[in-house]
């Protein structure tokens, strides 16, 4: 099983091929989350690194991220990767994406913590923010693969330019399982 396969370099693939002479892998990856770009199709990439018998299946259903969040996240990734596989959310949270100023960060967190006895929030993109009980502080890269009830993005346009910046914004947005808040300076 190879997870996050979109991030592997050719050298890393060669290492895996040496350790698995049968060349039988289950490969899981998302081109929309490839920070350093992924211009090939999966078929092209896997053939290029030496795999020949390839059976593909694409995930089309998103169980984690509510429709309200995906409606904001999809255009972000499609602007950089128009053919990205963006799965369809099967549920809504009933909570709209909120846009506010960075000055509202503490107030938004306090209100959420008071209203939610359980769950974890994550502030993404604010390096000076101090973690506390039930509130994490991460970079977009470190948030990859994780999920949080509330995600607060701080100045997401500062996450970078081009494909890498778009991927970081998309990944950060899609960590939300209930609510997304986008704060700008």
Which residue stretches match the model-derived regions?
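Conserved helicase motor core of SF1/SF2 NTP-dependent helicases
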Residues: 6-185
């Amino acid at each position: 099983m190879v997870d996050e396969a979109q991030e592997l370099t050719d050298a890393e693939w060669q290492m895996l091929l040496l350790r698995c002479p049968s060349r039988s892998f289950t490969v899981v990856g998302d081109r929309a989350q490839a920070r350093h770009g992924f211009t090939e199709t999966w078929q092209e990439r896997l053939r290029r690194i030496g795999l020949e018998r390839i059976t593909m299946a694409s995930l089309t259903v998103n169980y984690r991220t509510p429709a309200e969040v995906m409606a904001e996240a999809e255009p972000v990734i499609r602007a950089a990767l128009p053919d990205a596989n963006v799965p369809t959310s099967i549920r809504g949270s009933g909570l709209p994406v909120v846009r506010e100023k960075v000055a509202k960060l503490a107030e938004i967190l306090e209100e959420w913590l008071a209203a939610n006895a359980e769950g974890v929030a994550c502030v993404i993109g604010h390096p000076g923010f101090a973690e506390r009980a039930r509130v994490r502080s991460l970079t977009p890269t470190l948030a990859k693969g994780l999920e949080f009830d509330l995600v607060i993005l701080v100045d997401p346009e500062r996450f970078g330019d081009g494909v890498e910046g778009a991927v970081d914004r998309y990944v950060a947005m899609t960590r939300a399982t209930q609510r997304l808040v986008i704060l700008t300076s």
